[in-house]
Amino acid sequence: MQPRRPDRFDGLEYRGTSWGRGDGDVPPYQHGFPARSFSSSGDLSQHWVTTPPDIPGSRNLHWGEKSPQYGADSNAGPAAVGEESSSSSSGGEHLNRFAGFGIGLASLFTENVLAHPCIVLRRQCQVNYHARNYQLSPFSIVNIMYSFTKTQGFRALWKGMGSTFIVQGISLGAEGMLSEFTHLPRELNHKWNPKQIGGHLLLKGLVYVIVTPFYSASLIETVQSEIIHDNPGILDCLKEGIGRVLNLGVPYSKRLLPLLVLTFPTVLHGILHYIISSTIQKCVLFFIKKKSPAQLPGDGSNAVQNKLEDYFPELIANFAASLCADVLLYPLETVLHRLHIQGTRTIIDNTDLGHEVVPINSQYEGLKDCINTIKREEGGLGFYKGFGAVVVQYTLHAIVLQITKIIYSSVVQTAS
């Protein structure tokens, strides 16, 4: 085994020694203090052999020696322990990175790409007050998806996806800038107080106020029919949102509601969705951690398995939080989308037939009038039009989570 020290080293008492000239043996360390790792406590200093501290990836050890893992067999030779710990830690590190990247990519794909056709159908059903079929069943949603793709192609199910990313980017950017200038907390720590909660929710509310015109433009792109309109440009959402604020651009109908009327229901829906999803997420994580006791790190393969298992509770918590928030706020979302789409001269696909178009000519005066009109003309189930799309969306999400877990469990078993 060849030493991995450099040929030249400007350390203290090095160049003048015979070892520094290359014609002597390796001298023992003469420091009078025990070496410690950054993560070690006072009673664990005897487990380390390096000085200065053993930084992961460094080679400042004795020739042929490496830092043993805590809890490893102290009777084993230093070379054997070092080789075993190095191979297991390097393999675990690669698998952890691969697992984190793959699981994050699968979650991102599911939430933003795979779920988008369900979001398109869900919004079209919500704003279609002409519809006689409420599309409450997932089977009817699958049937209408097939009809749309047959007449317009697969592109019709992913319309407006670019604008949704733009709205998310505007939301994140606005939140960061507002937090920087107003010093409102973006996140809550464990020692929160009512003042911090109020400031945090105020920040979220201000973000939803800024996003409101762009959300309207994005909603139009996701529900308008591909039969009538051409594909919008990538930045059309930005231009239409700014034009909505400045009263410029395409002329709208007189029934168009002003942004001040749309701001309150938009902020209300956003704040309630955030509160519900955050509460459900923390509760699910609490019960999962309480149900599965913490495991002490063992050998390399078990450590990798434990590390992989740490990813999925958070994904499950996010899944449950989004599902509960979407289900509980579905009636309010239906009202919100109808108010946003009113007066925009939007023509949508006929969700009853799948091969025709219908115009949106509603005449709601505000939030309260929209609720009363839906209840009077469409009944209580009118607030849940297109609910089958939610069932399809989260069923696909659950399937992807399960497949991802099976794949990475197989990877870990193969590596071990």
Swiss-Prot record:
Matches recorded under Gene3D superfamilies: Mitochondrial carrier domain (1.50.40.10)
Biased composition (Basic and acidic residues): 1-13
Transmembrane segments: 101-121, 161-181, 197-217, 256-276, 312-332, 381-401
Intervals holding Solcar repeats: 94-185, 309-414
GO aspect biological process, one term: mitochondrial membrane fission
Name of one Pfam family that matches: Mito_carr
PROSITE patterns according to UniProt: SOLCAR (PS50920)
Any one of the GO CC terms: mitochondrial outer membrane
Composition bias, Low complexity: 82-91
Record field: compositional bias (Polar residues): 37-49
Membrane topology listed for this record: Multi-pass membrane protein
Main localization of the protein described in the UniProt heading: mitochondrion
Positions of the UniProt region annotated as Disordered: 1-91
InterPro entries the record matches: Mitochondrial_sb/sol_carrier, Mt_carrier_dom_sf, SLC25A46
Compartments in which it is found: Mitochondrion outer membrane
Keywords carried by this UniProt record: Membrane, Mitochondrion, Mitochondrion outer membrane, Repeat, Transmembrane, Transmembrane helix, Transport
Similarity comment: family membership: Belongs to the mitochondrial carrier (TC 2.A.29) family.
Function in brief: May play a role in mitochondrial dynamics by controlling mitochondrial membrane fission.
Name this polypeptide is given: Solute carrier family 25 member 46
Biological source species: Xenopus tropicalis
